[in-house]
Amino acid sequence: YLQSQERYESQKEICQVAKEYRRRGTGLDGIVLDWCSWEDGMWGQKSFDHSRFPDPSNMIQTLHDEDVHFMISIWPNMDPKCENHKEMKEKNLLLPFSDIYNARTEQARKCYWEQAKRGLYQYGVDAWWCDSSEPFTPEWSHTERVEPALQYEEYKRTAGDYLGEEHTNDFALYHARAIYEGQRSEEKG
């Protein structure tokens, strides 16, 4: 069983949830730290907010001691205040007119992985949830439910404006590839 909720607020909360599953004898294979693992206002930064997750290595080891794997959500978009964003921008690795890295280029994928490695993987992260892999999602701003066919057309048009219509479905593949190839390169050594 993989446990996830909208998000966990702290290292303490995650460890308590895993411990409670074990106390009850309920199966738990992994726990997901969804959005906001980063510092407040740093959306998409690939690092832990050390005020809420003061010792990520210890947190993950505590989970491993309970035979629980740790998965974290990572995002392709980064707030301009983030160090990750600044690095991507300085290296010209963002998609034009956006805060989303250009996963279709090898250099951007390698940079993205290095950021994930530095800020997250080094602590023992087991798995990745590549969130928002359809990075241009106009439905987030809707106030009313839109009929699915119209919503799909709106997505195609919006994503096509940024990626080119022929590439609206391949971003997720390249985004996942950044993590897959990056992590595999670490495990070969």
Region spans (language model):
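Catalytic-domain carbohydrate-binding cleft regions of carbohydrate-active enzymes
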Residues: 1-189
